[in-house]
């Protein structure tokens, strides 16, 4: 099973909402705690914000957006061997039991928010009184004879949210190839 799942849902107007998918309990049974938070990082992807309507005269603005985190903190797994950098739009962190493992972490200059999210790209603030550290982002494991991977970002491979590289898709293709053979 390959999960693309949010701990916190972000709608098209950049308004965060509680995730309503009802899969938190199932993930716990698999040994993965999907946290109800959002990970931010100083290692942020450049994102274009602004007018998407051609009739508007405002030009889009491209800026680093802390809620779209870039990382190359990977476990030594074959599914990551040809991947150089991954981008996670509005990702939550995961905690794993001993039976599960962490495939990908955020960069060490990262932190989490659990409430009072301000997703506006114009008001990205540096963390204050927050410990920066790497946070687990992708978990994998087995359950019985089955295998699973949890990617805590439902937009991880959606067209409008892909990074400038194909590495997000490359990871997914590698995972599918490994888990179906």
Model-inferred region functions:
Residues 1-180:
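Acidic, S/T/G-rich, low-cysteine, solvent-exposed domains in lumenal/extracellular/periplasmic regions
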